[in-house]
Structure formats: C-alpha cells, structure tokens
Amino acid sequence: MATSVDNRHYPRLNPAINGVVRSFKPPPIPSPRHQNKTVSFLTEKVIVKETKNDAVDDSYDSSDDEDESHNRNVSYYKEMIRKSHSDVEPSILDSRDESTADNWIHRNSSMVRLTGKHPFNAEPPLPRLMHHGFITPVPLHYVRNHGTVPKADWSEWTVEITGLVKRPAKFTMEELISEFPSREFPVTLVCAGNRRKEQNMVKQTIGFNWGSAGVSTSLWKGVPLSEILGRCGIYSRRGGGLNVCFEGAEDLPGGGGSKYGTSIKKEMAMDPARDIILAYMQNGELLTPDHGFPVRIIVPGFIGGRMVKWLKRIIVTPQESDSYYHYKDNRVLPSLVDAELANAEAWWYKPEYIINELNINSVITTPGHQEILPINAFTTQKPYTLKGYAYSGGGKKVTRVEVTLDGGDTWSVCDLDHQEKPNKYGKFWCWCFWSLDVEVLDLLSAKDVAVRAWDESFNTQPDKLIWNLMGMMNNCWFRIKTNVCKPHKGEIGIVFEHPTRPGNQSGGWMAKERQLEISSESNPILKKSVSSPFMNTSAKMYSMSEVRKHNSVESAWIIVHGHIYDCTRFLKDHPGGSDSILINAGTDCTEEFEAIHSDKAKKLLEDYRIGELITTGYDSSPNVSVHGGSTAVSLLAPIKELAPSKNIALVNPREKVPVTLIEKTSISHDVRRFRFALPSEDQQLGLPVGKHIFLCANINDKLCLRAYTPTSTVDAVGHIDLVVKVYFKDVHPRFPNGGLMSQHLDSLPIGSVLNIKGPLGHIEYLGKGNFMVTGKPKFAKKLAMLAGGPGITPIYQVIQSILSDPEDETEMFVVYANRTEDDILVREELEGWANKHKDRLKVWYVVEIAKEGWNYSTGFITEPVLREHVPEGLEGESLALACGPPPMIQFALQPNLEKMGYNVKEDLLIF
C-alpha cells in the first residue's frame, strides 16, 4: 500500500505502535479457483495492469464457481460497445464550455444541457439514447455534476479508508487493481430527478428540468467494496461501524463549502449480493472526467446520488454522512412540505425520507415527440409498434409492462426484452425494453397512450403525479397525447406529444395545458369557453431564425418559456437599463430571466408577448444547433464592436467570463471584500465607469444572477474587487432567508470559480462632467450623489474615476443613507478622499439609528438634508446620481429634488 493513515477523529480505535499505524498486507493465499494473470489496457495514456489476488479476509470472500455468471455476457456487451463506437461522433471541446473551468473536457455536442453552461448537467436526446440500445455509449451517458470537474492524475490518486476500521490505509490506483479482484458487469444508472420536468409543469420544485433520458446503462468494472472493507477490518455494529461514508474530491459551495458526500448502511456495503464496486472502467475504457475519473462508487439498484464520483475517502462511522449534500439532496418529502417548512421544521434530517433504491418506472420512447404517423392505405395495413424502457430498483426484476389506450380502463401486456442475466443472488441491475403492436386505427381513436410497469414485488406506477419539493422519483404513468393533423394535402395523420422536453426546451402537452390554465385563470371569458387543451389560437408562430434577427435597439425580441416577447418599447423604461435586455435580444433567455426577476416582473412581461416559438419543422438558418440548449453560444446573434486596444475580459456582453476567488477579507461582521482573478493576469475588466456586471452562480441547482459594481479601479490588471454586504438569514424579520447570493459568496472557499457577464447599465461616465445616458449625452459641473446601503458602489466608482483625473473639475456632493453607522460601506475610502480633495468632494451621512456622539444626520433623507448638502437643480449645471432601495428613490429623493429645481425625468440618473 502506498500510505497508511491514522484515525485522527476516532481516538477509541486501536492505538498506533510507536506513533505509526501499520499497513496490513497479508501474504498471498494459494487458491485453485483463481490463477494470477496480468492484463494491460492502454487507455488515455494510462496502462492498467490488473492482477487477480486472493489475499482478502476470508470472512468476506464472495468468490465461488458461480462468479463466472457475472462475466457470462461480457463479450456480448463489448461487441455492442464496439459497434456503437462507429455510430457516435467524436467528443469535442464545446464552445459552451470555453468560459468555464471545464473548458478542458471533451463532450458530445448533442447532449441536452439542463443547467446552462455550468456546471455540466445533461441528458442525451431520447431518440439517440434508444438508438444505441442496451449499452449506452459513454459520450451519451447522462451527467450529473454539482460543480467543476476535478483534474485528476492516475499516478497520484489515492483512496483513503479510515474511521472505524482496524487497519486504516490509503490505496493508489495501481494497488486497488492489483491487490483486489475486479468484477465487470452492466448496471443502469438513473438520476433520482429523472422525469422531474413533469413535476415542474404542475408546480415548480427546487430542482432543474430533467426529461425522461436521465438514465443510461454501462459495462462497469471495479473492485468490490466489501473486499476492501474486509481487508481493512471494518468494525462490527457493536463496535460502532454502522455507516460507510463516501467523499469526493470536488470543492462545492453547499453548507458553507464542502465536498460531495453521502453514505449507505454497513450491511449494504458488506453485502456481496449488492455488487457494490469502486469502478475504474466504463465500457472497457478508463472513466472519463465527467463520470468520475479515476475512480467512483457504483451501487447497483440505487439512485445515482449515492454513487460518489472522483472518490477520495471512505469513512466508517456510527452516524450517517454529515455532508450537506447527503441531507439537502435526494429526499422525497411529503407533498405538503415546501422549502420554507422544510427548513423551519428540519424535514431534511428525517431519515424516513431519504432515497436509496430506485422505484419502478417506465417510459414510452416510440413514438417520439412530434412524430407524425400518416393514416393511409399503406400504414393501416400493419400494426404500429410502441416501444420504451422500464427499470426498477434494489435488484428487482421488471416482470410486466402494460399499455392503455383508454385512460386505464383496459390494459395490454407488452413483450419484454431483458438483455442481462441475473447475478448469482438473482439480482437484476439493468433496464429492460418493452414493445407492443397496436392497430393504427386504435391509435387514431385514442386521446392518449399511457404505460406502467410492474416488478417482482408487484410494485407498480401510480396513475397521477405525486408532487414533492425536490421533484424526485417521479414515476406516474408516462402519457403521450395524440392529435389529428394534416401532414400532406388530402391526408390526415396522428401527431404524438410527449409530456415535456428536457431543460429549457419548449414543447410538450403539459406545457400547453399549463399555459392554458394560466390564461384561463387570468381571463374569465376564456375560462368559460375553453373546451380542449389543443384548441386553435390566434397566437402568431415564429421560427428561431426569425427571432435571431431581432437583436438590436431597433427591435429587441426575447424568448421565455417558448413565448416570444417584443421588448423594444420597454428598453427605455427597464429598471436595469437597456443593456440587460439587449445582451439577450434574439435569444432564448429563459434561465437568465427566471434567475433575476420577481413574480411581478413576470406578469408585466405578458404585455409584450407577440407570439410563440415554432418547436417543430426545420429552421432555415444555416448554422442551427441540433443539440438542444438554445442558450448555446452558436445561436447568439453577432455583436458589432471595435477590436479592443487592450486585453480586456468583457469583450462580448453576451458571454460569461470565469473568475476565480483569490482573496476574501472581512471588513465587518457582515461586509466582505472579495477579490476575483480574471482569466489572464494581463487582463483588465473593461467595464466602463457607471456600468455594472452580473455575477452568475449555480445555487441549489438553479442559476442565480445579481448585479454588482466593482470597487477596484477601472485600470486594475488581473483582478476585480467586490465589496458585498452579506444578508444573513434570520436577521431581518422581513427577509428570514437572507440574501441568496451574498450568503453564497460568503460560503465560497478560495479557488472557487464563478462567472461574470457585462457590461450592463444605461449610464456611462465619460469624464470631465460628461455622461452618456441611454445613448443621450448629458453634462454637469456639480453632481448630487445619493446612495442607500450597498447602492454606494456605483457612486463610489464615479467618484474614483473623477478623482483619478486631475483635469476633471467636477464637484461632488455625497449624501449616503444607512440603517446604522456600522452599515456604512467604504467609509474609510470616502472620508480619505473627502479630506484630500476638499474642494471637489463633500460627504454627508444619514443613519436611521445613531450612537451617542454621532455628528451627522439621524433619521431619513429629507428636504432639509438635501438643501443643506447638495446643490440646487440648475439646467446644464447639476445632475443627481442615485442608487438605493426603491422607497428611498420614490419617497425621499424624487419629490424633494423636484422641489429643489431638478427635472427628475431628465436630471435624476438612477443606476
């Protein structure tokens, strides 16, 4: 073994001898049942030499003559793999990953991305998944990543076994495969969120939109977990060895910063019938980065969330894993529990709601979504074959699949195709396929087609969807709807609709019914007249290529949830400035819109709706991406701009730029300064003075965007600084959950990677009193600069720019409001500048609650405060800049500035 380790956190275990815990390697035990032999696999420049070894604890020896049943079909599966290789295009460095920390990973471009660009969570298009049959090619295997993929080195990687074991140790990869026997067999992996989008169509869960292809099957090879734990001497239940915890290598933000971890019961870990392995090969090759290179856990029959990738530690403990992700993920809570109740009453920690084994499930894959079956003399002469997949958990065999064409009144039993043999304990770890021939005329008369499966324990699928907060384990009947259409002149046909399409792709009968429901609720006339969810409407339909043309200030269209909105007339009124719309004009910006807009804003959007996106047929654009994800870079309209004279990061406002946290400073109990490194050391941010950026993070599997103005100088090289007030939960009674992004930032460890996007904003300071506001020039000799709380940062940026130019004689008068004196941000810098430049900058504070000896105003910004500390409003002489909460702007600033002679529509510039 490479290294022995001590039980640092378990002093009750066997003491070390002279401070050293001896590694344990028993002598080889000859056995007639195995012959030592070496096999080399040359994969990705790593030579894997495997040697079968019988030197294991006899009490956990699962070997016997029947073990060969596991490998009975391996050659058959490998022939499948060989044939499928020729059908899969090479993986590439996808342009969608260019601005992320995963830009070194080759991926298949057809994968449907479910969480934007990063982290990479994706499923294959359902037709492609089924085209390859029983064994899924690795590039098309679904991927669930919580963060950045670790860069691993085979030669340096170790797996530590520690906790309640008598002989804790670290194994190198070479030791794992040479000192333990390996097993190779097929296993179907399924994400517990498979089919979640159906739940999100009923009511939004806290999870992203998995379709029905969050399932894949591979030939996995690895070392049995029970052999390793037996070698290391796992403690008995009486000795406290109750749980086996797994911990990965990636650094994640959850819980204030943690590794991905989870656990299973010791009895499961040591049960040879469960076939749990530390896998290092998939489909005959070393694991790829997205699938856990160099080693991961495979727990057959369990949800994917228990199969930790990039495995670094196995810890035997009395308690379950204490990982944030063990408790805050992969739970099925009762339908009555929402996020607020789950947090308030600690539902996450109730053991009865944890998910381990998969449930029974089945899906219709043929006909496909929007497939059209013509009805003519030829097609009606032979039956149509319905097809799909089914699986169950815990090693249970799927014994029956049934299809109904009449809503469940009658059922037809399907033919099953099981392409695996059970293990020697009778366990089945893989999906099966089903098919059923039906008469075309029966399909024509059916309103929908539904499927359900049964397993050997007579578990079956419920009729109706059972909603839960995380959207997990959805296994209601899978229904497709049928509609009559006219594919050709003089001919009719049946068009089939699946319930949803994965990710942010529009389409599916559930989306139509949901939209109809929303429309009917808001329109009582429509509510009375609606009789069919598939009625004709007057909504105009547009292709994606048509939408892309509308990407300018003259015509700005966006797509949100498949609906098209013309936002041109809203550009001048948008609170975030026209740039926030223009960087998304001509694209599907569903994810970005959902991340930053309130319910009120979503309702306002309806006033600008002009039509629907065509989701079928062909797009006339010559460079159409055919692999889902309308947020792909290739679909963004080109931006005309001058070539930058300097190396700047924000070259294209539509593209995200990765930044790395390199420094975090606590200025006060709730104020932090974060320094982020730009992609290149010689880069400047390239943010015009007065503009801001979006900071983008994936929090709880959802995109979160917040606007920030850097406090670093505009010419800072290689980094940016953000001063952020952290809004902690349970501090302010009106906001019990606190600030999502600020708490996330506070929890990030050094080295974390986020994305920024910009420039954004409608105000730009050009120098020497000149501004450009929504394309119109403005000038002032004197500036009234009014800020509330964190709203000081754009004001700070303008001050910094003016004072850095000795020739800029603009006078500045700052009134800065906060709740308490301790809440004042960048106070030291403001007062330092005011003392140094007394003729150019004056600063006055207003606090709601003052301490004894406070020398500034108390209460709120009032007319007397403004008259005393800022200049009168004179056309061509003065402008007011403001950034703060809306009530401050509306009630304290606008009416009082108007009294002082300001034209608040023209002379009050609100960031």
Swiss-Prot record:
Mark the transmembrane ranges.
none
Positions of FAD binding: 706-709, 723-728, 735, 740-742, 793
Cite the record's Acidic residues compositional bias ranges.
56-68
State where Mo-molybdopterin binds: C191
One of the record's GO molecular function terms: nitrate reductase (NADH) activity
**Record key words, sorted:** Disulfide bond, FAD, Flavoprotein, Heme, Iron, Metal-binding, Molybdenum, NAD, Nitrate assimilation, Oxidoreductase
Cofactor requirement: FAD; heme; Mo-molybdopterin
- Binding-site positions, heme: H574, H597
Domain of life where this protein originates: Eukaryota
Q: Please list the coiled coil stretches.
A: none
Details of cofactor binding: Binds 1 FAD.
Give the similarity note.
Belongs to the nitrate reductase family.
Q: What is this protein called?
A: Nitrate reductase [NADH], clone PBNBR1412
